[in-house]
Design a protein with these regions (language model features):
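S-adenosyl-L-methionine
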Residues: 1-51
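Long, positively charged, glycine-interspersed low-complexity recognition regions
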Residues: 4, 210, 216-290
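A conditional alpha-helix N-cap/helix-loop micro-motif detector
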Residues: 14-18, 90, 219
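Conserved proline-anchored active-site loop of SAM-dependent methyltransferases
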Residues: 25, 35-49, 60-64, 97, ...
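Short glycine/proline-enriched coil/turn segments at helix->beta-strand junctions
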Residues: 29-34, 54-55, 75-76, 91-94, ...
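Short, glycine/charged-enriched secondary-structure capping and boundary segments
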Residues: 51-54, 73-76, 217-220, 252-254
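Class I S-adenosyl-L-methionine-dependent methyltransferase module
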Residues: 52, 56-183
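Acidic, His/Gly-enriched loop-helix segments that form or flank divalent-metal centers
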Residues: 153-231
Length: 290
């Protein structure tokens, strides 16, 4: 059984993150020398696995560069020199870190602050990012003027300004560096079909869930092709899904909340599945580990 200090958050602030169930996923995966996180995304499972003591090496693969951003966070190489970002700067930015931190719901598409409170929030952030006391004091004066202007107009910004989500995201990134992971991290950027998994490794796959849309895959993920791939490979793949992939069987499940959009959530059953032809060997391995 995995024993580790419970964390508040794992991985990058990332839309679709497995942060809330990362410990459950890692606890259900068989211990091994190497774990491959095939659709790593925001690297919540990667991060949790690195801290779990179950693996000596974790390979985070994705078609995006998010695992590279996570690796930078692990190594303390996060560059905040361009922060904070205004709405116009966000629109022009192609930097993954900036677009994650300054997007609503970390979707990299929509700017995090509404137009009505952008001036106040950006001024508040500049008070924190200022390199010198003079810089921070100048930002403080701008913040006070902006806040006073809103209050004079009768705007109620107390609740909206009390949380600077971008600052919270940066604090989360910096906390990753302070976690002292036990496992070695490697990153890869390729399609899951092109990844060459090390022999004998534990392979975990968290593809976009069947029926969902995701921008990294041109608006849609070819789930039939993924199921065909599962049928062809000569190693077990542990798949997170709400529904059982073709040719697979369930090895674990739990209820969780799914955010259907940025405001509503529904209760769903999250399952962990493996190809049926590997089920007996996987379960035998679990019994041997007990």
């Amino acid at each position: 059984m995995m024993k580790m200090k419970r964390r508040k958050a794992y991985g990058l602030p990332y839309m679709g993150s497995k942060n809330r169930i990362a410990e459950w996923v890692v606890g259900a995966l068989p211990a091994n020398d190497t774990l491959v996180d095939l659709f790593a995304g925001g690297c919540a499972v990667t991060h949790c696995a690195m801290l779990s003591g179950k693996f000596n090496r974790v390979i985070a693969n994705d078609i995006s560069d998010a695992p590279e951003v996570f690796a930078d966070a692990v190594n303390g190489n996060i560059d905040l020199s361009g922060f904070p970002l205004t709405r116009d700067e966000f629109k022009e930015s192609t930097d993954t870190l900036s677009r994650l931190v300054y997007s609503f719901g970390n979707d990299q598409r929509y700017y995090i602050y509404s137009s009505e409170r952008e001036d106040v929030c950006i001024a508040a952030e500049r008070m924190m990012y200022g390199a010198t006391v003079a810089d921070r004091y100048a930002a403080y004066k701008v913040f006070i003027r902006a806040l006073s202007s809103h209050l004079q107009c009768g705007d109620n910004l107390d609740r909206k300004v009390s949380r600077l989500q971008a600052i919270e995201a940066v604090a989360r990134l910096q906390d990753i560096h302070g976690a002292c992971p036990e496992a070695e991290l490697e990153t890869s950027r390729c399609d899951y079909r092109d990844f060459d998994a090390p022999a004998g490794s534990t392979v975990y796959a968290d593809p976009p869930y069947n029926g969902t849309r995701i921008s990294q895959y041109g608006g849609g993920f070819d789930y039939d092709a993924f199921e065909d791939w599962l049928a062809e490979v000569d190693f077990p793949v542990f798949v997170s899904e709400y529904t059982c992939p073709r040719g697979c069987v369930e090895i674990a499940s739990r209820g969780s909340l799914s955010l259907a959009d940025h405001s509503n959530s529904t209760r769903v059953v999250e399952g962990l599945f493996v190809q049926e032809r590997f089920y007996d060997s996987v379960m035998a391995g679990d019994r041997d580990a007990e």
